[in-house]
């Protein structure tokens, strides 16, 4: 049997085994993803297996570069990939995609024992702020400007000059008007 015939048989088997399984996804006839763990599980991860042209005589390409795995540290990812690579070497020459997915499911706790959700991986935003100079955080704390409606902006523009400043003396008290309201000392 040739490599293409083996691949076609394995593809048919995978489709029938994982029919209706939300964790399994066929990206292409030679590339598959499987989510190990339930939805919302902080220790869940995604494995992508891509077949080469000579698969199963040669090893498939195993990847954990999916966005789903961004919370997992690179050390844990490398550890998982190394253990999966050992399983590949044992099964070389046979259809192994199903075997790899099941191996990962069976050893999930062992794979993720060094993974501490929330602590192990730094989100991309933190990586960027760590690499930028210390002056960057102060620029991020700019005050939010108040959102004004068109009418409010127009009213404000009518009261202010071209720089947005109120004219000199806008809050001055009209002395004559003020004195006429208060009265004189003689009236007392």
Swiss-Prot record:
InterPro entries on file: RWD_dom, RWDD4, UBQ-conjugating_enzyme/RWD
Domain of life: Eukaryota
Biased composition (Basic and acidic residues): 155-166
Disordered: annotated span: 132-167
Segments forming domain RWD: 9-111
Gene3D superfamilies in UniProt: Ubiquitin Conjugating Enzyme
Protein name as catalogued: RWD domain-containing protein 4
Organism: Mus musculus
């Amino acid at each position: 049997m040739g490599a293409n015939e083996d691949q076609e048989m394995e593809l048919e088997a995978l489709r029938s085994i994982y029919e209706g399984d939300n964790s399994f996804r066929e990206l292409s006839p030679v590339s598959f993803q499987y989510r190990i763990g339930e939805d919302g599980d902080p220790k869940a991860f995604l494995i992508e297996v891509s077949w080469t042209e000579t698969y199963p005589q040669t090893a498939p390409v195993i990847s954990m570069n999916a966005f789903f795995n961004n919370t997992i540290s690179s050390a844990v990812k490398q550890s998982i990939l190394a253990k999966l690579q050992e399983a590949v070497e044992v099964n070389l020459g046979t259809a192994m995609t199903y075997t790899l997915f099941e191996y990962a499911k069976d050893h999930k706790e062992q794979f993720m024992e060094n993974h501490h959700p929330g602590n192990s991986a730094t989100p991309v935003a933190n990586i960027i702020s760590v690499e930028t100079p210390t002056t960057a955080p102060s620029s991020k704390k700019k005050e939010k400007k108040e959102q004004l409606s068109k009418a409010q902006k127009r009213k404000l523009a009518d009261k202010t000059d071209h720089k947005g400043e109120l004219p000199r003396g806008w809050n001055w008290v009209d002395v004559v008007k003020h004195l006429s309201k208060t009265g004189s000392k003689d009236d007392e």
